[in-house]
A protein has these predicted regions:
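Generic hydrophobic, amphipathic alpha-helix propensity
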Residues: 17, 21-29, 46, 68, ...
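Short secondary-structure transition hinges
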Residues: 66, 106-145
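Secondary-structure edge/capping motif, primarily at the C-terminal ends of alpha-helices
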Residues: 87, 116-122, 177-184
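Helix-turn-helix
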Residues: 24, 28, 32-67, 71
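Hydrophobic alpha-helical connector segments
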Residues: 85-113, 163-170, 192
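C-terminal peripheral helix-coil segments that are non-catalytic and often amphipathic
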Residues: 1-9, 107, 141-142, 146-154, ...
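Amphipathic alpha-helical packing segments from all-alpha helical-bundle domains
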Residues: 81, 128-154, 164-168
Length: 205
């Protein structure tokens, strides 16, 4: 085995270890947040939960606690959007497309610990989490706007309201449903159906 191959293998191992440690810190941050809230989720508490030192936290997240929670929120946003895009592509028709986006958001909101952070307390921490908040909502609104514009061109809508405004209102309803589901995960089906019923009023009979 050449020295180059050994060096590459060592570098790859270090990268995997670094990624694993980073993920463990993110999981510890979420766990600490769910137990004590943002105010008491200090770097010391997060490091202790992960079995790491404060230095390790700062080595991976130079901004400390805020950097940790920004990345955590961004990861959840990206996962939500990816799931939404998957379900949206499989949907057939406006009603199914709207339901698909609601389902994606409520699935994430229903997860233990995750829903508390992402759907309830996370958005309220705008100062600490900027500029990563609102990305999932923005992506949802963009997809909905295109769907509504397409339906309007086909004469399928029962409203003449601006699709951009309607899309923002629908996302707001989904976010509100996400708060409920984060606290009561067993209501995910009920809330998804409610969003669909709300959307049905937009479509001509």
């Amino acid at each position: 085995m050449s020295r180059t191959t050994v060096n590459q293998g060592t570098a790859s191992l270090r990268q995997r270890q670094k990624a694993r440690t980073r993920q463990e810190l993110l999981e510890a941050a979420l766990d600490t947040f769910s137990r004590v809230g943002f105010g008491l989720a200090t770097v010391e508490a997060i490091a202790g939960r992960a079995g790491a030192s404060k230095g390790t936290v700062y080595a991976h997240f130079p901004d400390g606690r805020d950097g940790l929670f920004r990345e955590l929120y961004e990861d959840l946003s990206n996962r939500t959007v990816e799931r939404a895009q998957q379900l949206h592509q499989e949907a057939d028709g406006l009603l199914s497309q709207i339901r698909a986006l609601a389902q994606a958001l409520l699935e994430v909101s229903s997860e233990p610990k995750v829903g508390l952070f992402f759907s309830i307390q996370g958005p309220a921490l705008s100062q600490a989490l900027e500029p990563v908040t609102g990305r999932a909502s923005g992506a949802f609104a963009a997809m909905l706007r295109q769907d509504l514009e397409s339906a309007a061109e086909q004469g399928a809508l029962s409203t003449a309201a601006d699709p951009e405004i309607v899309s923002v209102m629908l996302v707001g309803a989904m976010r509100a449903a996400g708060i409920v589901v984060a606290e009561q995960p067993d209501r995910i089906g009920e809330l998804t159906d409610a969003i669909e019923d709300l959307a049905r009023g937009l479509i001509k009979a």
